[in-house]
Amino acid sequence: MAIANKNIIFVAGLGGIGFDTSREIVKRGPKNLVILDRIENPAAIAELKALNPKVTVTFYPYDVTVSVAETTKLLKTIFDKLKTVDLLINGAGILDDHQIERTIAVNFTGTVNTITAIMSFWDKRKGGPGGVIANVCSVTGFNAIYQVPVYSASKAAALSFTNSLARLAPITGVTAYSINPGITKTTLVHKFNSWLDVEPRVAELLLEHPTQTTLQCAQNFVKAIEANQNGAIWKVDLGTLEAIEWTKHWDSHI
């Protein structure tokens, strides 16, 4: 997918990886970049607008834990304004295994609900034009960081959901792929809680190993967007982009 002249919605486009990815997107000249985030950051929005004045950058406050109905209402406002949306990026995420319910709500349920809401506008069975979804999951969806099993499981769930969305594309007209960053130097990983405090030093121990910068992650994120491969499972780790082959151990045969 060429980003130029496209209309893009980016959930959590002002976060660590999100903001650098927003920068890379704006450089490529989309028609509209609509950022949905929990906390407004006028300075960040101003920076994006200045980076490429030809791009219309707008912000709407959005908490992914709201209901599908509330999300649908917000999306209707956006679709009424833009008429079409080409790409939805779901980037919301938290890392804190003390907050079990919120971790699942933000990392998994919020993604499911946001996508469920946008299907009202995209699903070809309802006369929609289809669309593309990029879900930010995690390498922990492949193999857990076992000291944060709630976070890891929430990302595995998001990855599984994305894989199913891709298989449903012939029915819905909506394609999907996952972006799975490795350990990236953001505020998310500088300090976080393990489940039941099984490893109080989990953040410190994790950062003893090689990491990537948010810019490295963002640059490869955009390459994955441009590749636009339905069902792709992209590993974005240590400054590299790699398509992962998923091993099938069972098939429903339906």
Curated annotation (Swiss-Prot):
If you read the UniProt record, what top EC class would you report for this enzyme, in one word? Answer: oxidoreductase
| Outcome after substituting Q147P | In strain: VRF
Q: Which residues form the active site?
A: Y151 (proton acceptor)
According to the UniProt entry, the coiled-coil residues are: none
Oxidoreductase in keyword set: yes
Instruction: Provide the effect of V236L.
Output: In strain: MJS 115, MJS 122, MJS 127, MJS 132, MJS 133, MJS 14, MJS 147.2F, MJS 154, MJS 16F, MJS 36, MJS 58.2, MJS 68, MJS 84, MJS 87, MJS 93 and VRF
In the record, biological process GO terms are: alcohol metabolic process
For whether the record's keyword set contains Transmembrane helix, the answer is: no
Please tell me, according to the UniProt entry, what happens when changing Y146L: In strain: VRF
InterPro entries, from UniProt?
ADH_Drosophila-type, NAD(P)-bd_dom_sf, Sc_DH/Rdtase_CS, SDR_fam
| GO MF term set | alcohol dehydrogenase (NAD+) activity
Give me the segments passing through the membrane: none
Recorded GO CC terms: cytoplasm
Give its E.C. classification number: 1.1.1.1
Keyword annotations from UniProtKB, A to Z: NAD, Oxidoreductase
Where substrate binds, per the record, is at: S138
State the SUPFAM superfamilies in the record.
NAD(P)-binding Rossmann-fold domains (SSF51735)
Q: Which residues bind NAD(+)?
A: 10-33
Q: Which domain of life is it from?
A: Eukaryota
Annotated family:
Belongs to the short-chain dehydrogenases/reductases (SDR) family.
* Binding partners and assembly: Homodimer.
Q: What is this protein called?
A: Alcohol dehydrogenase 2
